[in-house]
Amino acid sequence: MKASLTRLFTEDPLARLARGNPAFVKRYESEPDPFGFSLETYARWEPFFRFLFEDYFKVEVRGIENIPAERPGILVGNHSGLLPLDGAMISMAMTGQHRAPRRIRYLVTDWFFSLPGLADWVKETGQVRAT
């Protein structure tokens, strides 16, 4: 446990993500994103959201095989409260459990894009302005 925590804070995040999910990194490492998604930022935050997915919420995924590997699709989550954690959990499932790991874009309220320091993070982690 201690060695993995040390590695979490000392290893290059993108190298760690590439080792754990090479198909996802290969798919998006050279693709410019019109919405501002940053693979480096995603890699930096992936362990936190993976912890929420696997250990905190203990998400159980069913039906992921029905989501197309290439074609567009719409996934609808329903959340209450301010934070769109359903979108983040769907993203974790799609990057970690789908046969063709895909980036998920989830809609967030404009308000997040007006907050100093948070606006860039929101874009870089794959979120899109809802209006």
Describe each region flagged by the PLM.
Residues 1-130:
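Membrane-anchoring hydrophobic helices of lipid-metabolizing enzymes
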